[in-house]
Amino acid sequence: MAAADLLVVILAVIAEQINYIYMFSDFLLTLPVCSLALVLRLATTDWSVWFTVAFTIDRYIAICCQKLRKRYCTERTATMVILIVCAGGCAKSTPFYFAMDRRRCVASNEYLTSSGWRIYELFDSIITPLLPICLILLFNALTIRHIIAANKVRRAVRNSSENGKDPELESRKKSMILLFTLSANFVLLWMPYVIHSLTWQTENYTYADKYFSTPIYILQQFGFMLQLLSSCTNTCIYGLTQRKFREELKNGLKYLFTLNRQVGT
């Protein structure tokens, strides 16, 4: 998931968005490099989204399905899931290679006017991110319901005279907070993109007109911004909730400050 998010930052933010607006690299604007970059950006975005779905399902099985957990939570299963997600993302994104004009790095007239492309864009929007949003909400709701039911049973079994906090209940509470945060973050950041993609086609993607500012275009760019932000926040949220990760981060910051003091003296 982290690797896919990093690829989104490199390909979508640095190689495309920043280049189109500020850098104007001729190499990235040539054909077929431009078309290939578009396919890679869409594929890595699909990977990022569906790895988030896979992580959500993995947490559901690990917490709620103890019998299935032994058979599912294996290295072989993880490898198969990664390969399927990567292959599926590439297959779904490849048709967009032919959406660009054959002479310059802009959308072709056929893409802008064809009903076939409009139907495929609708299909693309359903597969990513409408279906993932539904799956994430569903499995997180089932997981949270299981945790709440298990907490009620544990409280009933515990001796009423027992004092102090229950480490198991605290751990489950943190899991609920993590799942809720990931779900809310993903859904809220993707929602503007979903609204735009289900209603209008993408326009002025390569910023050929720097002064283009219709309300629909502003919604499109706002959706792009939040979509790209979503690709990195989920991994950060999950990482910061892990105790070992926080300890390593603190040690790294302490080392930098110590090194800075040594250099200064």
Locate each region found by the language model.
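Hydrophobic alpha-helical transmembrane segments
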Residues: 52, 78-83, 122-123, 179
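Intracellular effector-coupling site of seven-transmembrane GPCRs
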Residues: 3-4, 81, 145-193
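Hydrophobic residues within alpha-helical transmembrane segments
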Residues: 3, 40, 84-87, 127, ...
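Loop architecture of class A 7-transmembrane GPCRs
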Residues: 22-46, 71-72, 76-79, 88-137, ...
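Extracellular TM2-ECL1-early TM3 structural module of rhodopsin-like
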Residues: 1-57, 62-70
